């Protein structure tokens, strides 16, 4: 541990001197800490691997100003003086390590509930502060998003921010801004005001404060007959001085700064699942991506266009199509009778993107369905379907039909 007056730095390397550090906390971002200094001795190359991910805890007057883990560290020596630089992040960054995919169908749950569920899957947790949570309007898809990114997106739907919590040596998130203290700023080095104009009739004042005193995000300050809430914080140690930089706005403007975030990657996706129930024109689907029992009945549009004629059976496979980014903008577009009684609808389902013919046999890898039986062979793709051969390709049938909505092009090379 290194102690500099009221400043304590707990870390598992022998620090002789800290030249400077900067800690930045802004909404919806992991807090980052950059430190430069001098070591008591050269720890050798093992520090580059052994000390990565080690805990670092910085306190001022006994209160935590940063808690996180070291992600990058470098050492260089000059005249037997061993300098180091390191970059550390709040433990919330651990929530970015893996991608998650799941469809949340229970519309009685709130956006905060969904964020907490996903975060807890990855050994994290969320505390709520002054949020106006609300139930989801329809099924919500988390598709290849980290737990942190998904939680940020859910927070945006209820017009609030996420902040990394630094109470523990594990991922913890604060959703919303806690109600802080009313402060009388002291030790002011400088202050400024920025007028930020959003539209002709709408603007806000951002207050910047540079001070020797430490405050918390969520604390309030009276200025120009307005109560401003501190929502950004930077801690700076340089030339032996510890300085705190803050930004504040009127709390009512914070919601105006937040816009719903969307996952653009979901548009046009389709997911296979099994029909568990068909009721009142709605299809209840257990998806292959998460294997959860269904809570929501989806509209569906059969390829025949005749909903009454093409009533799906329980146990059939079906495809859920994601039409847009809005909550619940999805429906069932087709069914496949792999478990039904119609022998013409037997199917083979496997993997991702190609159909291969070789001397070893035939292998099929696709997101869609290859239908095979004694009387027909059907290959359907959501996008392009390509069949190629190094030698001769023969197609033989009593009747051969080529049908195109736009054009048929013959190319000979």
Describe the residue ranges of each PLM region.
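Long, charge-dense accessory insertions within large macromolecular proteins
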Residues: 198-290, 298-302, 307, 321
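Short, Lys/Arg- and Gly-enriched loop/turn segments at beta-strand edges
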Residues: 63-69, 226-235, 325-335
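Short, solvent-exposed secondary-structure boundary/capping segments
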Residues: 74-89, 236-249, 283-285, 342-346
